[in-house]
Swiss-Prot record:
This is Small ribosomal subunit protein uS8c. The keyword Plastid applies. GO terms for cellular component: chloroplast; ribonucleoprotein complex; ribosome. HAMAP family: Ribosomal_uS8_B (MF_01302_B). The gene is rps8. The keyword RNA-binding applies. It is found in: Plastid, Chloroplast. Its main location: plastid.
């Protein structure tokens, strides 16, 4: 049983990127679905599919994106910020810019999970889940 599904998802994607795997399978939940759809909308992953496992649970099959013949990953780094032992919150004025706006921060707000740009635009703060660049 996984206690932190977000950290598990980030670790699986990071490990699959390191060995240049095309697909990675992660546990499906509302949070992981939202994070995966943000990664797809921002162009970090190619495709997301929901599949049923043998045990009857649903999981996400994420197709990672690579560029060029050397298959350089679009995701350079994924970093978990708010952890179960140390939660990190920010209001709309304190939301950090990742690499000067090149990367994104994924934030859990009262209006759902969204990117840092959208949270600043809607003037909502929340828990900073992870950074992606």
């Amino acid at each position: 049983m996984v206690n932190d599904t977000v950290a598990d998802m980030i670790t699986r994607i990071r490990n699959a990127n390191l060995v240049r795997q095309t697909n990675v399978q992660v546990i499906a939940s509302n949070t992981t679905n939202s994070i995966a759809s943000i990664l797809k909308d921002e162009g970090f992953v190619e495709k997301i599919q929901t599949i049923e496992t043998d045990s009857g649970l649903s999981s996400l099959l994420i197709t990672l994106k690579y560029q060029g013949k050397r298959r350089k990953p679009y995701i350079t780094a994924l970093k978990r910020i708010s952890k179960p032992g140390l939660r990190v919150y920010a209001n709309s004025r304190e939301i950090p810019r990742v690499l000067g706006g090149i990367g994104i921060a994924i934030i859990s707000t009262s209006k759902g999970i969204m990117t840092d740009r959208r949270a600043r635009h809607e003037k909502v703060g929340g828990e900073i889940l992870c950074y992606v660049w």
